[in-house]
Amino acid sequence: QPSITGDLVSENDLVLLVMPQDIQAPKGRLILPQVQTMRELLDKKCLITSCTTDKLPQTLKALAYPPKLIITDSQVFKTVYEQKPAESLLTSFSVLMAGYKGDIRQFVEGASAIDRLTENSCVLIAEACAHAPMTEDIGRVKIPRLLRKKVGEALHIDMVSGSDFPKDLSKYDLIIH
């Protein structure tokens, strides 16, 4: 049976969820990957605690022992990594969901295509989410900025969302979904 957290944790393991307040989620709500992950951890009989990024130091200090696993949002991964106990594993909700809903080995192999990109390459960024793009949207702003910084400003990037997926993908050197 597919599992979000796989064999990363087992019964009685302490798991810390670091969840910045997502501007996509209405006040008083959590985003679906957070809810699904918490439900699975409860079903596995793990001990779960959560905090926002700004409360991470106080939360770690309040714990009797370091968490086995820390799960956070990709946007604060570096911040959490810099503060986590050395013995705690760290992953993100996005990585867990990618492994749960897709072929994580294929995704890792696909990511290696980034190293082969040149300024003449063509990249497709296909967003499946239906939310309205935000100012610093990861798919429309952050990923293109990082790719152009690595490869060069002339890198051609096409952006599609929802069901607006091109039929012919042959011109693309990399597709990010």
Features from the language model and the residues they span:
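C-terminal-of-GTPase-core extension/linker across diverse P-loop GTPases
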Residues: 1-139, 145-148, 153, 159-174
